[in-house]
Amino acid sequence: MRLNIFYILLIALCGLYGCKNHQQPIIKENLNILPTIYPEYQGALLPVNIAPLNFKIQDEGDEWMIQIQGKGNPITITAHDAVEIPIKRWRQLLHQNQGGSLSITVSSRKKGEWYQYSPFTWDVSTDSIDSHLAYRLIEPTYANWNSMAICQRELSSFKETEIISNKKSG
């Protein structure tokens, strides 16, 4: 009986932890420069059905807080390395901002203090992108030419499938 109560409390605590809100940090200084991100997406024009534009921040920092704002609920993400945008909330935000723009604000924590970079924007088109992209997958050195494949990627998600491969076709 005590073991059951323990597990129930543990599950409840995990659920409460998952529902925590991202509190806005107290900013020590506005840096008045754009963050260095890879790939460099600042000022991009986005089709309304594109997959999330995940990126890495190349500036120094112990922790990052990214806020993507437009019409509707903003997306707030904390990260230590790569910034991965939740796909469901991303799609909602893009559809709510068709023909408008999104403002992306990046803050970094360095030695316990928070610094905010200048925000940048992404414009959201009312047009959609084609559903798939086909490409040839081959090692960069061309040493393994016998392990080539023709693949496709769904551009509104990260789903990749192999169309044909040297290994399967002989």
What are these regions (language model features)?
Residues C19-G170:
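Sequence signature of WD/YWTD-type beta-propeller architectures
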Residues M1-I26:
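Bacterial Sec-dependent N-terminal signal peptides
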